[in-house]
């Protein structure tokens, strides 16, 4: 009987220690450090992208240039600079920015779509198809960029009209 009582007390003490340690570990440290990485919002990029998609290309370029000053490795900002310049008819500038975006991120889907559209504007569907092939290898199960560029190429081949792709 005495052995059972000792065993019971020992078990109770052990369980109590385990429970207390679990609570301490669950509480974590008392400092304010966050172990999760904090995503920094680039207001210049967001404003530039919004203006570009609303047809305000010159204003977009101003914001996007500020964005790349702050983050020269932002492939998205370079892509949108290419987009804005393409829409303004600044083809050489557009190529410069698209190529920079692809140098930073060779698998950037948006850039492959947009540079493909630029090649269509210049009546170079074969080069557009090269970027469609890139998208095909990047988007294993399909993606909007692939579908959109494919349709633009098909439309170009049907009409042979150089437009604002």
Feature-to-residue mapping (PLM):
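Alpha-helical segment of the N-proximal tetratricopeptide repeat
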Residues: 39-70
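Helix-start (N-cap) detector for alpha-helical repeat units in TPR-like alpha-solenoids
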Residues: 41, 75-76, 109-110, 142-143
């Amino acid at each position: 009987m005495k052995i059972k009582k000792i065993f019971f007390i020992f078990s109770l003490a052990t369980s109590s220690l385990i429970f207390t340690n679990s609570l301490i570990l669950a509480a974590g440290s008392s400092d304010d450090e966050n172990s999760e990485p904090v995503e920094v919002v680039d207001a210049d990029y967001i404003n530039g992208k919004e203006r570009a998609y609303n047809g305000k290309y010159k204003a977009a370029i101003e914001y996007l240039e500020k964005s790349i000053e702050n983050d020269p490795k932002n492939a998205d900002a370079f892509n949108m600079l290419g987009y804005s310049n393409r829409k303004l008819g600044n083809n050489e500038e557009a190529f410069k920015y698209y190529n920079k975006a692809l140098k930073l991120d060779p698998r950037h889907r948006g850039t492959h779509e947009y540079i493909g559209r630029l090649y269509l504007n210049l009546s170079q569907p074969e080069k557009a198809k090269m970027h469609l092939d890139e998208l095909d290898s990047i988007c294993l199960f399909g993606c909007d960029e692939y579908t959109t560029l494919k349709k633009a190429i098909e439309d170009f081949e049907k009409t042979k009209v150089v437009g604002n792709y």
